[in-house]
Amino acid sequence: MNRQQNDLILQFAAVIIFFMVMVFGFSLFLAGHYTPGGGFVGGLLFASSLVIITIAFDIETMRKIFPLDFKILIGIGLVFCIATPIASWFLGKNFFTHVTFDIPLFILEPVHMTTAVFFDFGVLCAVVGTVMTIIISIGENE
């Protein structure tokens, strides 16, 4: 997929669509654990936005935008997915019981968080890493 493309309209539209899909994916990720959305759907949207950039430009351009190796991203996601239930277990709760806490912010009110956000973040990283590893391996063989 290392070819010169002169599709100016496609490239311009892809950049705009990239940001729109990323914002929508982030909002679905934050919608999270108990409502439609979460790590899997957000990860699919994040990966699809990177696929749009890959189609409009090439793999090297996409790697400049996201320089982290996607196989490492799969490992990071698995660490979050495994560490979240183990952390609640060490805090004296049952395995996979979510712990709630507040993050104090200086000017704003504290943000209420649960460990489900970290688990969903791990799922997001694993999904993005898996989808992009598959897409890149298919694209590099052509």
Swiss-Prot record:
GO terms for molecular function: antiporter activity; monoatomic cation transmembrane transporter activity. The chain crosses the membrane at residues 9-31, 35-57, 70-92, 116-138. It is a multi-pass membrane protein. GO terms for cellular component: plasma membrane. It is found in: Cell membrane. GO terms for biological process: proton transmembrane transport; sodium ion transport. Mnh complex is a Na(+)Li(+)/H(+) antiporter involved in Na(+) and/or Li(+) excretion. Na(+)/H(+) antiport consumes a transmembrane electrical potential, and is thus inferred to be electrogenic. Does not transport K(+), Ca(2+) or Mg(2+). May form a heterooligomeric complex that consists of seven subunits: mnhA1, mnhB1, mnhC1, mnhD1, mnhE1, mnhF1 and mnhG1. This is Na(+)/H(+) antiporter subunit B1. It comes from Staphylococcus aureus.
